[in-house]
Amino acid sequence: MPQLHTPVTLPPSPPRLGYGQQALSFGSCFSEHIGAYLRDGGLQLQVNPLGIQYNPLSIAAGIERLFFGERFTEADLFEYGGLYHTFLHHGRFSAPTAEEALRLMNASYEAVQTALPQLRSLLLTYGTAYVYRLAGDEYGGVVRRVVSNCHKLPERTFVRERVSLETLLATWRPLIERLRERFPELTIIQTVSPVRHLRDGAHGNALSKATLLLLSEILTEQFPATCFYFPSYELVLDELRDYRFYAEDMVHPSHLA
């Protein structure tokens, strides 16, 4: 029988997630689905404590705040459309009052703080190298800061760009050093989401994914005792190279995949 897929070789000794260990997952919508499967399997895993974050700069900013920063206050909030938001959180943390928004945000912050003493693994899912930066300070944010969520603000509020590999490395190298210093036994498992972002066309998506793959590769090479790569992207695009394994939008992996 002819072989109808391209086998993908898994890393020889990928780090294993223990049932008694704490793990945190940050990243795109793909991480939400994988995280649900892992939790259903009995792992102690908190998934996206700030909500979905698609790009590595937002993920890094979220880790910085939750691991090394303070609780959220009214100074972090802005109001738009009858709801209070931050540029670091997903819309599921937004609320009609500042008090309720801060309650939701700080409950998640405290849950992370509780998990940190036993933290052993970080799961990072990079979705895209395209980011939205604040074009001005109209909503209290810092100009040029990358946001995790646009919260349906007017398009003029942001500048969209594909960040360079050099920019990503300049953020992640010092962050990993800081994490290694505080959590000597920490393992960081990186993966690239196979979900395609086609706003910029197939070629634009390929450039974005290539940037993320290079980021993962370089960090794995430079921090071999801490950083690892799991080939989710390759497994879906090669081993599951059949549209039966895609949802109706032909972009997201299906439940069968």
Q: What residues fall within each predicted segment?
A:
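Extracellular glycan-modifying ectodomains
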Residues: 1-257
